[in-house]
């Protein structure tokens, strides 16, 4: 009975991480792929290059989102890209945990949808109450926290 509980918690953990990385990707598309990449065991020159590119991608998106010229995440192809990013991030995390991939993949995509429309709703609700960049920074903090949770050791 102890093994079943341990396995169940492990499965739940993978699923929770999958949804979390999906929600993070819905907020910032780069957060589906970059955090799993940055916390991977990739080494050597190509591993270093991949990690730098991932970090720069996140930094660029976090910065670009604050610009007045940033488009809506709800414009096409925004939602599908964010859902795919969440699904791929969840797939990487599931493979890393040596778990099945179907449910994590689905939860990553669902989290991507939740983060996309939930984040847009948060930003719309914040309009007029505070400057948009402040609402964006709060969303960044939530998304980065979810990505950190999803990729923790």
Regions found by a protein language model. Give the residues of each.
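Short amphipathic, positively biased membrane-proximal segments
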Residues: 1-153
């Amino acid at each position: 009975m102890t093994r079943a509980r341990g396995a169940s918690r492990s499965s739940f953990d993978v699923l929770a991480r999958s949804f979390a990385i999906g929600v993070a990707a819905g907020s910032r598309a780069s957060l589906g792929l970059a955090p799993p990449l940055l916390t991977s065991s990739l080494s050597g020159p190509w591993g270093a290059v991949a990690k730098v590119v991932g970090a720069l991608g996140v930094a660029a998106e976090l910065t670009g989102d604050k610009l007045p010229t940033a488009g809506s995440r709800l414009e096409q192809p925004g939602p599908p890209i964010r859902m795919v990013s969440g699904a791929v991030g969840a797939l990487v995390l599931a493979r890393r945990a040596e778990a099945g991939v179907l449910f994590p993949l689905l939860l990553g995509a669902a989290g991507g949808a939740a983060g996309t429309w939930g984040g847009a709703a948060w930003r719309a609700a914040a309009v007029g109450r505070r400057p948009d960049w402040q609402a964006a920074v709060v969303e960044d903090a939530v998304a980065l926290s979810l990505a950190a949770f999803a990729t923790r050791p």
